[in-house]
Design a protein with these regions (language model features):
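Active-site hotspot residues in diverse enzymes, especially metal/ion-binding acidic/histidine motifs
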Residues: 1-191, 196-329
Length: 329
């Protein structure tokens, strides 16, 4: 089988499932790989092993010439999507993120403590240790409960992505966030939404994929959204009402002076997003967040927290390098 094995042949097979050569070279192979090895069958066999491991592929299907490359079989998966008429699920994104989730599970020592079903109970717990409920305090709470959290966006170009994913393992759930919006407040809502799925027992095993987190007619999604709102805002859902603001500056000043001054335990980004959703002024809300957080780094906050929780000694050199790359640390 190895006599005619070339990297060009593997690249050709992988491109058919959406994994182009540049992506595979950057994310599947270790940095020490030299293109002089591309036509040496024994070396290519070793390279195929790295590709399969990093990209969650079935190695046998990658090596068998006439067989289509397959991803490793995922656990039972529940997809949550905004458009129920769209049956194009983000399978490629799920496969890549699931490998990331698996590495997180292998690299941390946590044991899950079931969550209270009442969001306000969790909110009170967080506020007993932190001044407000925001992305950082939510991360601290998740890890204290044995819930590992990571952010992943190392996908091939034009890949159908997802907002959030929960993957269960024997001792803990792993949450992966992947929203293109990296504002801390957006990611905090997405994380609170996934906590809602866990607390309300929408998933007890396997995988749940939130393709897009919106206000829609799916019962479980509505419940998770309500849970997230109560967790972030307490009793202040829609507290800004239907006031009109001409621009981001006046909006942010009003919220600071007339709301946050009276509710210091609420993150300003959370109430701004809440206003945008209730009044269909989402563009104004997002523009205001950009003023308040001109260089959004919610993804880095998540992965820096994760990097400090990982036992890096558990990984071989190539996996260590891959994790550094996808974590951005």
């Amino acid at each position: 089988m190895t006599e005619s094995l070339t990297m060009a042949a593997l690249y050709g097979k992988l491109s058919k499932i959406g994994l182009k050569k540049d992506y595979v070279r950057k994310n599947g192979l270790p940095s020490w790989w030299d293109d002089e090895l591309n036509d040496k069958p024994v070396a290519v066999l070793e390279g195929a092993g790295y590709i399969a491991k990093n990209l969650n592929l079935d190695l046998s299907s990658l090596l068998t010439p006439q067989e289509k490359v397959k991803f490793n079989r995922p656990p039972h998966t529940k997809f949550k999507q905004h458009n129920s008429q769209n049956n194009q699920h983000p399978h490629l994104a799920q496969a890549l993120a699931s490998r990331f989730a698996e590495l997180i599970y292998l690299g941390v020592e946590v044991n899950y403590t079931p969550l209270p079903k009442d969001a306000k109970t969790i909110r009170e717990d967080i506020l007993s240790h932190w001044p407000k409920v925001d992305l950082t305090s939510l991360l601290d709470y998740c890890w204290s409960q044995g819930i590992a959290v990571g952010y992943f966006d190392h996908f091939p170009n034009k890949t159908k992505k997802f907002a959030g994913l929960i993957q269960w393992y024997s001792t803990c759930p792993v949450i992966i966030l992947s929203s293109k919006y990296q504002q801390s407040a957006r990611l905090a809502f997405n994380l609170a939404h996934e906590l809602g799925h866990l607390a309300l027992a929408h998933l007890n095993n396997g995988v749940l994929v939130d393709e897009e987190i919106t206000f829609d007619n799916d019962r479980e999604e509505k419940e998770a959204n309500q849970f997230a709102t109560e967790l972030l805002l307490g009793d202040c859902d829609n507290c800004l009402g239907d006031r009109k603001f001409p621009n981001t500056e006046k909006f942010s000043i009003y919220v600071q002076e007339h709301f946050i001054s009276h509710h210091p335990d609420i993150d300003i980004g959370a109430i701004i997003l809440n206003y945008g959703w209730h009044n269909n002024y989402f563009a104004l809300a997002m523009a205001t967040l950009k003023v308040l957080e001109p260089n959004p780094n919610g993804n880095k906050i998540i992965n820096e927290y994760l990097a400090n929780k990982l036992d890096w000694d558990k990984f071989d050199d190539e996996t260590y390098e891959y994790l550094e790359k996808v974590l951005g640390v």
